């Protein structure tokens, strides 16, 4: 064996490595900076932690001042209970909190913050000053940290009851982190979004935001339905509530309320989705999956639903201590929560009918306005009156221009010769042209606007594609193929639900390789697969045999579908893969069976289609998410012709 000798420089390097490998206690500042890597990602992360502390303190008004998107300055001031002078040093210490005392408190925590590390992390990467005063204190106190050990320095200050936290020069001592920040507008958009989420979570708190000296957001306390709706409109835009369904349901200790946008108000990005669990804004895969399922049949490809939903559940049934940012939660019974959310939203969207989308009540009959020659217009259809002096104008008689009409005053215009049609004959021709079609009489139409169906009565068909109808609000345009496709699709789904998913045994069972966890999951949910039309048998630790598949499925699709269902069952405790696949097949059948373009329909057939739409779930969209009808009110039509301007 040959001995390897190290020269002097190599030995020194080896000794250095050995010395570096020794375990040492990190300084408090370095430890906090490491923790800040998880908690403080950008200015929006800072504002989230500070707002949570303000809300937990019982604040009813929060003022936020920001400069350069929070990178230069971020100041939060509240009127909460404040912090006593004795507790101020602990407020900036790691793992120090007033919100929990033991594990039982953690398992039922209702406060937004509880980890006791936010202020310590922020103060390690920025210049932080905290000033506070309690209601029973004679004066306020201020605390700052300094040095490698982050020693707290407390001194008297002037401040009303409440707390102010001032954060300056974010990431001044960690320039590498600062390089990852985006443009000022991007960072402010993230910060603004956090504040909007907090404002939606707490209607009872006033929020005021200023950026670079300019007021950006000013929201007063909202204690009634009108004020809450006003706040939602201010944050989500006025169009949201106009195109949203209010929902509220409570069952088995689960309470869900809020607003879900109609499919016609979908977005190209998922930027108008707010979900709160016990007042905490969360982003959860289980919730996203339930919402996606509920909207599955009514959203166009690539579109995202809109919603503001508040979910309330026993605190012991949800774990909020999943991630330092507290964005994620874990439900104790995820499947029950998933099914509750999906079922509630699915029913709410299914109950939408044209009358809901038209805004409810029929508009009151307007005062008759003058028409015809007196108003400078033609008369209404069937009563078009032509002035005698026009029809009886002498042939070749010039229209004399007023004297002094400028350079063209000597020009005279002679109209083309007319045939001299008598007035009575012309009026008779117009009456015949506008006479009602055979089979439709005025007596068959409703006598009052309240008797008119939501989609009204058909007037005509355009290019064999669209139905034109009149309702109490104005003109209705219907894509007849898309509408009939939805009607057929819903009827096929009902028939399938009544008959169930019948299974077809395979002559030769097919084996599928899975993981041991997937095989265990298949055994645990064997009845679920049976309801879906499958018959599975475990052949080994990592092998399943497929003995029966749903009758409508092809054998080649069975393996992939079983794998997808298993993945869903392990992730969410439930799966809709088979149903979704069946719906695709039914949708194809409905598409091929629906009325095709260029097919001429009689008026009674068009009216029959309109009545079917009014009584069909989700009739506002076809199977692919495209709208099936639209409304043009009288005001919209007046704008096209510049009436009333």
Swiss-Prot record:
Residues 353-381, 395-420 are annotated as: Disordered. SMART domains: DNA_mis_repair, MutL_C. Pfam families: DNA_mis_repair, HATPase_c_3, MutL_C. InterPro entries: DNA_mismatch_repair_CS (IPR014762), DNA_mismatch_repair_MutL (IPR020667), DNA_mismatch_S5_2-like (IPR013507), HATPase_C_sf (IPR036890), MutL/Mlh/PMS (IPR002099), MutL/Mlh/Pms-like (IPR038973), MutL_C (IPR014790), MutL_C_dimsub (IPR042120). CDD domains: HATPase_MutL-MLH-PMS-like, MutL_Trans_MutL. One of its GO terms (molecular function) is ATP binding. Keywords: DNA damage, DNA repair. SUPFAM superfamilies: ATPase domain of HSP90 chaperone/DNA topoisomerase II/histidine kinase, DNA mismatch repair protein MutL, Ribosomal protein S5 domain 2-like. GO terms for biological process: mismatch repair. One of its GO terms (cellular component) is mismatch repair complex. HAMAP family: DNA_mis_repair. This protein is involved in the repair of mismatches in DNA. It is required for dam-dependent methyl-directed DNA mismatch repair. May act as a 'molecular matchmaker', a protein that promotes the formation of a stable complex between two or more DNA-binding proteins in an ATP-dependent manner without itself being part of a final effector complex. Belongs to the DNA mismatch repair MutL/HexB family. NCBIfam families: mutl, PRK00095.1-2. This is DNA mismatch repair protein MutL. It comes from Pseudomonas syringae pv. tomato (strain ATCC BAA-871 / DC3000). The gene is mutL.
């Amino acid at each position: 064996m040959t001995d390897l000798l190290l020269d002097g420089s190599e030995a020194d390097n080896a000794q250095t490595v050995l010395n570096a490998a020794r375990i040492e206690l990190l300084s408090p500042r370095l430890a906090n900076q490491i923790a800040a890597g998880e908690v403080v990602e950008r200015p929006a992360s800072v504002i989230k932690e500070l707002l949570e502390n303000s809300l937990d303190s019982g604040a009813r008004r929060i003022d936020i001042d920001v400069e350069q998107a929070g990178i230069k300055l971020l100041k939060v001031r509240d009127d909460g209970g404040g912090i006593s002078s004795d507790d101020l040093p602990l407020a900036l210490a790691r793992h120090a909190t007033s919100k929990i005392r033991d594990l039982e408190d953690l398992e039922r925590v209702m406060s937004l913050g509880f980890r006791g590390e936010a202020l310590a992390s922020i103060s390690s990467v920025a210049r932080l000053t905290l000033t506070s005063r309690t209601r029973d204190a004679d004066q306020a106190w201020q605390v700052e940290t300094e040095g490698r050990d982050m020693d707290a320095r407390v001194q008297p200050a002037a401040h009303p009851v409440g707390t102010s936290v001032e954060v300056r020069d974010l990431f001044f001592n960690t320039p590498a982190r600062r390089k990852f920040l985006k443009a000022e507008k991007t960072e402010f958009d993230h910060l603004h979004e956090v504040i909007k989420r907090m404002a939606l979570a707490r209607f009872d708190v006033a929020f005021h935001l200023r950026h670079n000296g300019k007021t950006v957001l000013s929201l007063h306390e909202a204690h009634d339905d009108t004020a809450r709706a006003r706040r939602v409109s201010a944050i989500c835009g006025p169009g949201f509530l106009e195109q949203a369904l209010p929902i509220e349901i409570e069952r088995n200790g689960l309470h869900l309320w809020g607003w879900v946008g109609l499919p016609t108000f979908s977005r190209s990005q998922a930027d108008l989705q707010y979900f709160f669990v016990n007042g905490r804004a969360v982003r959860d895969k289980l919730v996203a999956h339930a919402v996606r399922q509920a909207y599955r049949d009514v959203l166009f490809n690539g579109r995202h639903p809109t919603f503001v939903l508040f979910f309330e559940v026993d605190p012991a049934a949800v774990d909020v201590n999943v991630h330092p940012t507290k964005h994620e939660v874990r439900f104790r019974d995820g499947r029950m929560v998933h099914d509750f959310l999906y079922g509630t939203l699915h029913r709410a969207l299914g109950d939408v009918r044209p009358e809901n989308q038209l805004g409810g009540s029929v508009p009151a009959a307007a005062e008759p306005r003058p028409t015809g020659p007196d108003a400078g217009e033609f008369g209404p259809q069937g009563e078009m009156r032509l002035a005698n002096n026009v029809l009886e104008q002498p042939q070749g008689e010039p229209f004399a221009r007023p004297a002094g009409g400028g350079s063209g005053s000597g020009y005279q215009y002679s109209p083309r010769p007319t045939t001299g049609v008598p007035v009575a004959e012309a009026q008779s021709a117009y009456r015949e042209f506008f006479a009602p079609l055979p089979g439709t009489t005025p007596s068959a139409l409703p006598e009052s606007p309240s008797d008119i169906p939501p989609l009204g009565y058909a007037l005509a068909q355009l290019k064999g594609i669209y139905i034109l109808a009149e309702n109490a609000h104005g003109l209705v345009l219907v894509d007849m193929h898309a509408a009939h496709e939805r009607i057929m699709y819903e009827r096929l789904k009902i028939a399938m639900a009544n008959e169930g998913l019948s299974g077809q045994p395979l002559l030769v069972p097919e084996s599928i390789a899975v993981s041991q966890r997937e095989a265990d999951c298949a055994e645990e949910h064997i009845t679920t697969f049976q309801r879906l039309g499958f018959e599975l048998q475990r052949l080994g630790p990592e092998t399943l045999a497929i003995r029966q598949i749903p009758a409508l499925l092809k054998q080649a699709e069975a393996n992939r579908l079983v794998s997808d269902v298993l993945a869903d069952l392990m992730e969410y405790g439930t799966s809709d893969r088979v149903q979704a696949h069946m719906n695709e097949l039914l949708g194809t059948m409905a598409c091929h069976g629906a009325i095709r373009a260029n097919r001429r329909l009689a008026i009674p057939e068009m009216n029959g289609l309109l009545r079917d739409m009014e009584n069909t779930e989700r009739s506002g969209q076809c199977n692919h998410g495209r709208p099936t009808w639209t409304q043009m009110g009288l005001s919209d039509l007046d704008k096209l012709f510049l009436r009333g301007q």
